């Protein structure tokens, strides 16, 4: 009798579909929750410190030691950041289908550290090579050797590969530490996404302030070496918390591949495409009602096919439908995210041309102004949690305050507004350069304070809190349970594709406006460029994307995760 009561208590204390580090059912009191989540948040702080230590000032390195033009450097930055944001789809696939999130994080971290180490080595070789060239040839415009360039870009893309495996799995693994079947832990999981973003913003801000200063005022080798050290510390912290984690059962034991299950739905539906979907006793009543009228092509996978084709289960069909419904939302997210790619490229290059003195005798590096994004997030997240959400709950009578799609939509509006503000500030900068006769003096400092750029950086932080966090929570919540790494990867891939599109737009516009001897919108001399026209174009794109998003969000049917 006592044994039976002990077993019942153990079952009541355990978390369904999760095990501990020994492979036993995960206990609520001994694993998971905020205790484990803070280890994982700490890991992400270190990783974001490393990533932004490289990415935030990359355009300065490309146009400086590597000697690239502004347009070429902007395209290279967008291509790299786009690749780094697309690769999480592959990393999530490997995690969800084969390795599991924990093992994928460890392997990806090792690749990440290798890339950062080689990046540091390449920067040492580049700086040594440039120094030797200038001593022997007295050529101030010397460029690094080709093979050293190759090493630099290979190491840079190794970092992207490491980030591709690390990024979607760490956040999903953190969210896995909360049991959605427990009402209190479900609320905590919602807060996790907000505090996750606030904490990693601390890592980003610290990186932008410290690492960028070292890169601009000490040397690039040390500026790349510090992020490598932080990534080593992040991996050590992650391994230290191993015994406290809850592991999804798929990470510790074999199970049906979710990709195979859902892929089979599309295959069977295609084979049954000529069959008529009618309730003739072949379908269960519940399955028929759920599928009737929405994506009926996939619902045909529920029918027994010719030649003895086994029908798919209603759960598999519903999971496939959930993924398909996400595609239109994902596409509009891509369009509205294009403006986000500009802060690490043109915002930074514009900052080089203006007065950057913020204190007597102290001139802030232009890339360090990105720290204002983190400051905005520090203010916006607590305001969102403690002020905005309670007011929204009073008005809407919903526990969540606003829906995830409403949160994303608010971010889209702010994104369009941000491009309008950026365009107006750039018009002011060009006008000031013209008034003081500095149009043909690109190296001269325009008598305009860098504080003019504050609003567009603060708006970027607010966009993150609404659009980026909302998108991550939405895709994590709405994909099938076994594919949550893929869900987060989809939100990241929207940013990646947006970076590629931004690079493509820059290439096309640079060619179209710069041919026949004209001044390109992205002229290396920014005083003769028209980046403001580009910002107006992006504001229009984002507004159109928001209108499409409004229509699609009204048609979207939320997937009830708590019932799956």
Curated annotation (Swiss-Prot):
Tissue-specificity statement: Expressed in shoots and roots.
Q: Name one GO cellular component term.
A: plant-type vacuole membrane
- PANTHER family in alphabetical order: OLIGOPEPTIDE TRANSPORTER-RELATED
**BP GO terms, sorted:** nitrate transmembrane transport
Query: Which keywords does the record carry?
Result: Membrane, Phosphoprotein, Transmembrane, Transmembrane helix, Transport
**Principal cellular location given in the protein's record:** membrane
Provide the taxonomic classification: Eukaryota, Viridiplantae, Streptophyta, Embryophyta, Tracheophyta
Per its UniProt record, what Gene3D superfamilies does this chain match? Answer: MFS general substrate transporter like domains
Q: Does the keyword Transport apply?
A: yes
Q: In this chain, where does the modification Phosphothreonine occur?
A: 104
User: What's this protein's family per the entry?
Assistant: Belongs to the major facilitator superfamily. Proton-dependent oligopeptide transporter (POT/PTR) (TC 2.A.17) family.
Write down what this protein is called: Protein NRT1/ PTR FAMILY 5.16
Instruction: Supply the InterPro entries for this chain.
Output: MFS_trans_sf (IPR036259), NRT1/PTR (IPR044739), POT_fam (IPR000109), PTR2_symporter_CS (IPR018456)
Q: Please name the SUPFAM superfamilies in this protein's record.
A: MFS general substrate transporter (SSF103473)
Q: How does it sit in the membrane?
A: Multi-pass membrane protein
**Membrane spanning stretches:** 49-69, 80-100, 110-130, 145-165, 192-212, 220-240, 327-347, 358-378, 408-428, 450-470, 486-506, 533-553
Q: Which GO terms describe its molecular function?
A: dipeptide transmembrane transporter activity; low-affinity nitrate transmembrane transporter activity; tripeptide transmembrane transporter activity
What subcellular locations does the record give?
Membrane
């Amino acid at each position: 009798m006592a044994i039976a009561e002990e077993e019942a208590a153990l079952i009541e204390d355990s978390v369904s579909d999760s095990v501990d580090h020994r492979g036993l059912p995960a206990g609520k009191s001994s694993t998971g929750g905020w205790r484990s989540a803070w280890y994982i948040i700490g890991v992400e702080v270190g990783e974001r410190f490393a990533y932004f230590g490289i990415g935030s000032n990359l355009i300065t390195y490309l146009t400086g030691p590597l000697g690239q033009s502004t347009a070429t450097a902007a395209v290279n930055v967008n291509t790299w950041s786009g690749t780094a944001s697309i690769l999480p789809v592959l990393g999530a696939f490997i995690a969800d289908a084969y390795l599991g999130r924990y093992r994928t994080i460890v392997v990806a971290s090792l690749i990440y550290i290798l890339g950062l180490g080689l990046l540091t080595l390449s920067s040492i070789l580049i700086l040594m090579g440039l120094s030797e060239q200038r001593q022997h040839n007295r050529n101030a415009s010397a460029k690094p050797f080709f093979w050293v360039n190759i090493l630099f870009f290979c190491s840079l893309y190794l970092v992207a590969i490491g980030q591709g495996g690390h990024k979607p799995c760490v956040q999903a693994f953190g969210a896995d530490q909360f049991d959605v079947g427990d009402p209190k832990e479900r609320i905590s999981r919602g807060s996790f996404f907000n505090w996750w973003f606030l904490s990693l913003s601390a890592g980003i801000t610290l990186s932008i302030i410290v690492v960028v200063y070292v890169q601009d005022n000490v040397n690039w080798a040390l500026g790349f070496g510090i992020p490598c050290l932080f990534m080593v510390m992040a991996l050590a912290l992650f391994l230290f918390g191993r015994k406290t984690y809850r592991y999804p059962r798929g990470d510790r034991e074999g199970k049906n591949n979710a990709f195979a299950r859902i892929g089979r739905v599309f295959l069977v539906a295609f084979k049954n495409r000529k069959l008529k979907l009618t309730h003739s006793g072949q379908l269960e009543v519940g399955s028929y009602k759920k599928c009737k009228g929405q994506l009926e092509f996939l619902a045909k996978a529920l029918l027994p096919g010719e030649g003895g084709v086994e029908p798919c289960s209603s759960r598999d069909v519903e999971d496939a439908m959930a993924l398909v419904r996400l595609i239109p939302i994902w596409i509009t997210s891509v369009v509205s995210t294009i403006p986000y790619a500009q802060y690490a490229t043109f915002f930074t290059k514009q900052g080089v041309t203006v007065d950057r003195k913020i204190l007597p005798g102290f001139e802030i590096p232009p890339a360090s102004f990105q720290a204002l994004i983190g400051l905005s997030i520090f203010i916006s997240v607590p305001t969102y949690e403690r002020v905005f959400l309670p007011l929204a709950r009073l008005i809407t009578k919903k526990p969540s305050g606003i829906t995830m799609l409403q949160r994303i939509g608010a971010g889209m509006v702010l994104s369009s507004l941000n491009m309008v503000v950026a365009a107006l500030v750039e018009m002011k900068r060009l006008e000031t350069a013209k008034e003081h006769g500095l149009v043909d003096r690109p190296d001269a400092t325009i008598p305009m304070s860098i504080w003019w750029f504050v609003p567009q950086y603060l708006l970027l932080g607010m966009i993150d809190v609404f659009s980026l966090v909302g998108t991550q929570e939405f895709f994590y919540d709405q994909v099938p349970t076994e594919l949550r790494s893929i869900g987060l990867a989809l939100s990241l891939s929207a940013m990646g594709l947006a970076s590629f599109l931004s690079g493509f737009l820059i290439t096309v516009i640079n060619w179209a406006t710069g041919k026949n001897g004209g001044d390109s919108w992205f002229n290396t001399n920014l005083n003769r460029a028209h980046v403001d026209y580009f910002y107006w174009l992006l504001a229009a794109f984002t507004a159109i994307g928001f209108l499409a998003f409004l229509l699609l969000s009204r048609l979207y049917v939320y997937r009830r995760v708590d019932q799956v």
